[in-house]
């Protein structure tokens, strides 16, 4: 059917938008599931998805995993499949999974960061763009000047590219503030 991407920096509302879209389809009696990578520790338990604002959605069909393609048959019963924090999944696994299911009539809604704190794109997003029907890029609010923020800046531990954290570790910033303040240690 189709693949939709929701992307942007930290605190731009990607998970919130994913939850909103899935909820709309659930109201239309569609069979929906949300997948999150098992590395994501924002979840209270296996049946609750929570965003950085603390908004929770209880979801009977919520799956945490680190590998997608070997579980593809599990998703036959679902019409709408949401994937949160896609940057944590292996990019080839994610692409094959999304493309296969979309080609078999499923709507896939993928949410993930547009880039790491060095402004390097995540392969999962880059590889999804050519096979997607819809891309939504969200913005946050700059932590310094309160203008629109399109980048994520890491406060410390800058030698570790993938590190799970919240506002204790990452902040959204605009281009100017990224360039002026990217030496925070």
Swiss-Prot record:
Disulfide bonds: none
Active site per UniProt: 85 (proton acceptor)
SUPFAM superfamilies in UniProt: Glucocorticoid receptor-like (DNA-binding domain), P-loop containing nucleoside triphosphate hydrolases
Span of the signal peptide: none
InterPro entries for the chain: P-loop_NTPase (IPR027417), Thymidine_kinase (IPR001267), Thymidine_kinase_CS (IPR020633)
Enzyme nomenclature, EC number: 2.7.1.21
PANTHER family assigned to the protein according to its UniProt record, in alphabetical order: THYMIDINE KINASE, THYMIDINE KINASE, CYTOSOLIC
Protein name per its UniProtKB record: Thymidine kinase
Source organism (scientific name): Choristoneura fumiferana entomopoxvirus
């Amino acid at each position: 059917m189709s693949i939709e991407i929701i992307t942007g920096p930290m605190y731009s509302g990607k998970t919130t938008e994913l939850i909103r879209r899935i909820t709309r389809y659930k109201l239309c009696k569609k069979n929906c599931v949300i997948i999150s990578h098992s590395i994501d520790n924002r979840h209270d338990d296996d049946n609750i998805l929570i965003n950085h604002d603390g908004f929770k959605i209880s979801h009977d069909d919520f799956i945490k995993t680190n590998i997608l393609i070997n579980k593809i048959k599990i998703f036959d019963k679902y019409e709408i499949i949401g994937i949160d924090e896609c940057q944590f999944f292996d990019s080839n696994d994610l692409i094959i999974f999304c493309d296969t299911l979309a080609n078999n009539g499923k709507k896939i809604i993928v949410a993930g960061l547009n880039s790491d704190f060095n402004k390097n794109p995540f392969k999962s997003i880059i590889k999804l763009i050519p096979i997607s029907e819809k891309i939504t890029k969200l913005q946050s609010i700059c932590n310094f000047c309160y203008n629109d923020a399109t980048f994520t800046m890491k406060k410390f531990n800058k030698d570790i590219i993938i590190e799970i954290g919240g506002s204790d570790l990452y902040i959204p910033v605009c281009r100017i503030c990224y360039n002026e303040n990217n030496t925070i240690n």
